[in-house]
């Protein structure tokens, strides 16, 4: 069965989720092109992390978003690297009122050249980029949470 036929056979909710993922990936790609100083304020609390706990309904939605991004980033007509995928996941989760943490890391490739990576976590679920995250040292985090949750984020850090 062709890709289009498979897509058309999906139920309406899945189609909308996949279209949303493509739009979010496009937006994430644009965000990568912008100066980071312009993007950073929209990413959340700098050097903070959201809690690892999530309720079952949120976890279900997070897994759906993760699967949609993992599937659709391979089918965009442009390359979607780790940072754009993380931005896309953050955007999709924010639309659902679900908090997340963006991790930025650095490491070295096999030739000793400096490389960077980004990944996204929500609750105890890694949404994007977890396949190679253990090869990088975290240099920055951004906790995307609502202003009323700042106290919970700070308590999580102390805990």
For the regions a language model picked out, list residue spans one by one:
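Helix-boundary/low-complexity linker signature
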Residues: 1-159
């Amino acid at each position: 069965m062709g890709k289009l036929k498979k897509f058309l056979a999906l139920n309406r909710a899945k189609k909308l989720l996949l279209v949303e993922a493509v739009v979010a990936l496009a937006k994430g790609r644009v965000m990568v092109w912008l100066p980071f100083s312009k993007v950073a304020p929209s990413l959340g609390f700098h050097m903070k992390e959201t809690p690892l706990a999530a309720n079952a309904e949120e976890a279900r939605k997070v897994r759906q978003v993760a699967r949609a991004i993992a599937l659709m980033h391979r089918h965009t007509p442009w390359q979607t690297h780790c940072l754009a995928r993380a931005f896309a996941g953050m955007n999709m989760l924010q639309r659902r009122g679900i908090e997340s943490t963006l991790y930025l890391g650095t490491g070295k490739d096999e030739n000793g050249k400096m490389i960077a990576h980004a990944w996204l976590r929500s609750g105890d679920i890694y949404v994007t980029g977890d396949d190679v995250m253990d090869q990088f040292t975290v240099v920055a985090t951004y906790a995307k949470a609502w202003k009323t949750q700042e106290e919970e984020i700070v308590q999580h850090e102390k805990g």
